[in-house]
A protein has these predicted regions:
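Residues immediately within or flanking Cys/His clusters that coordinate Zn2+
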Residues: 77, 95, 116
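Short cysteine-rich clusters marking metal-coordination/redox-active sites
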Residues: 98-101, 119
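Cysteine-rich micro-motifs
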Residues: 116-123
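Amphipathic alpha-helical recognition patches that constitute DNA-binding helices
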Residues: 23, 100, 114
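Short functional micro-motifs and their immediate structural scaffolds
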Residues: 105-106, 127
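Cys/His-coordinated zinc-binding microdomains
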Residues: 28, 102, 123
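Interaction interfaces in information-processing and related assembly proteins
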Residues: 1-92, 129-139
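Short Cys/His-rich "knuckle" micro-motifs
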Residues: 108-112
Length: 139
């Protein structure tokens, strides 16, 4: 997600105008491309490095590295699903609005986290509720 200047809303411009939506569409598509390229590099790297080491220490090190790479790729797969979901919300007109309250998420939050589905307030409420639930479970 490099190389994108923050969107500057023009005076009188509606929230989630066509220009604004196109700005976020381009950010999301670029982010998706970067992630897909990284996945391809990892697969290639793992194929190249998949040697059968006779030394158990070398084999253990390689398995540990592969495990870390696979966990990273799993997180990236989840992020790709969020990106695809955000792109779908751009298409259906719900992008930029809180999934819980329907209020504007806000440009600053979307610039920081283009896949955000909740306003800052809704996210804080959710995190507080989760913390309280965990605290209750720890008793």
């Amino acid at each position: 997600m490099h190389g994108f200047a923050p969107y500057h809303q023009r005076r009188g411009e509606d929230y989630m105008s066509d220009d604004m939506l196109e700005h976020f569409r381009q950010i999301l598509l670029a982010w998706k491309r970067e992630l897909m390229e990284e996945v391809d590099r990892t697969v290639g790297h793992m194929k190249d490095e998949a040697a059968n080491f006779p030394d158990p220490n070398d084999r253990a090190t390689q398995e540990s590295e592969f495990s870390l790479e696979l966990r990273t790729r799993d997180r990236e797969r989840k992020l790709l699903r969020k990106i695809d979901s955000a792109l779908a919300r751009i298409e259906d007109g719900s992008y930029g609005y809180c999934a819980e309250t329907g209020e504007e998420i806000g440009l600053k939050r979307l610039e920081a986290r283009p896949v955000a589905t909740l306003s800052v307030e809704a996210q804080e409420r959710r995190e507080l509720a989760e913390k309280q639930y965990r605290d209750w479970d720890d008793r």
